[in-house]
Structure formats: C-alpha cells, structure tokens
Amino acid sequence: MNISIVVSTRDPVGETIKKLGYKFEEIDEDEVDFRFERGDAIVIFSKHQSSSKTPALTVHYPGNPSSQVLGGEPEKLGVAFPRLLTAIFREINKLDIPVQKTLEATHHGPTYQKVPIVFVEVGSDPTYWGNEKIVKSLVESTLSAIDKVSSLYCEEIIVGFGGPHYAPYFSKLGEKVCIGHIISKYYLASIKDTTIIQTVEKCMENVDTVVFDSVPLSVRDKVMHVLKDRNLKFKFH
C-alpha cells in the first residue's frame, strides 16, 4: 500500500519536520483545505491548537459533520481508514512524553479527496510545534505504525457517536478495536441522515459496530433507524 506522508509549508510542525531532515511530500496549501491526492491514503502532520493550550499529540479524520465549515465542504466527511489511524494512535501511546495523547472526533477539512486522510498533530502552541525532540518522536512513531497497518490486530471496526471532542472513551477502545469516524456530542442534535450514512459508507474498511458514548435515547434511535439495514451491531456506553 502506498501511503503518502505530507507536510504543509504553511504549517509550523511541517517546518520543524523539514528542519529535522525528513523528505516528505510538501504542499503549499492550508492543511485544512488542501487538494493534494496521491497514493492509497494520506497522513499529514500539522499543528494542533486549543484554547487551553494543553500539550497534546492527537490523531483524527477530517470532515464537517454539520453546515459549519473549517475547510472542505459542509456536511461532508473524509474517508476513514481505521487500521491506519489506530496503528498510529497505538504507537503514539507508547511514547514516554509527558503530554496528552488522544483521538479527536472528526473535524475540519479537507473533504475533497477519494482516499483516506489521517491528521497527526502536535499541540498546542509554538513551544511544542517547534520542539524537535517531540516532533521527531511523533514522526518516527508514525512511520513505525505505517509499517504495521496490514498486520494490525482489530477485534472489530467501529464508528462512534457522542462523547466530547477529545474522545477518551474511544481512545481507550482503540487499544483493541480499530476506530472509524467519531461524531462528537456537539453535532448530534442536528445531525442529518446523510451524515450518519457517511460514517459507515466513507470508510476504507467494513464497519462492524456503532458505539454510542452517553448519547440521548432520541439520537440513538435516529442513528439506529438510519443504519438499520446495514447488518451492524450497536453498543452503548
């Protein structure tokens, strides 16, 4: 499998990776709205920002679950690749670095590509974006993970609904299962049927199970109704 590794010349983590001597694909585009598409899947390194400025290493898929857009298109998800995302996250979790390590729910663009995209991010301020030791460790873990994708152990492939944007429950599940799209609780009240369907259809691997994390009964019923004919299991937390 040909997995393209990408950095943006407009991104500070990308610049740190270049300083370290890595030769990855370079794009001169905003990382949340790029059009690059080469290979069977894309891994892009980028900065992570948060208001709390919590030091973190995060992994997630792109996609806009609502009409609110930050790059890409409204109500459109990117393509998920559960074994790739989960392999990367498991390797990052092994790092002896005192920062938060977490999956994030699906958010921001791009959404144009027909191949999966996984964001691997360093947060949450310039101190960490330019920290060569942390960035190098992240890159090496990701490269190691890519080599393990084809043989990665997955009890099942899941998609998730509910929980906060930083997804501790789904991050914990990732120790044994492989994770597709996660739609956080903030989008559920107004989520459209078409977006629910995309969580399953826009996945490189067949989804086995839908997992709900503290989701109201009305939303659970809606999701289960929309996906009722797809031979899926449903689990509740």
Curated annotation (Swiss-Prot):
One of its GO terms (molecular function) is zinc ion binding. Its EC number is 3.1.1.96. It catalyses: a D-aminoacyl-tRNA + H2O = a tRNA + a D-alpha-amino acid + H(+); glycyl-tRNA(Ala) + H2O = tRNA(Ala) + glycine + H(+). It is an enzyme of class 3 (hydrolase). GO terms for biological process: D-amino acid catabolic process. Transmembrane segments: none annotated. Keywords: Hydrolase, Metal-binding, Zinc. Binds 2 Zn(2+) ions per subunit. The keyword Metal-binding applies. Its cofactor is Zn(2+). Pfam families: tRNA_deacylase. It comes from the Archaea. Belongs to the DtdA deacylase family. D-aminoacyl-tRNA deacylase with broad substrate specificity. By recycling D-aminoacyl-tRNA to D-amino acids and free tRNA molecules, this enzyme counteracts the toxicity associated with the formation of D-aminoacyl-tRNA entities in vivo. NCBIfam families: PRK03995.1-1. PANTHER family: D-AMINOACYL-TRNA DEACYLASE. Monomer. HAMAP family: Deacylase_DtdA. This is D-aminoacyl-tRNA deacylase. It comes from Sulfolobus acidocaldarius (strain ATCC 33909 / DSM 639 / JCM 8929 / NBRC 15157 / NCIMB 11770).
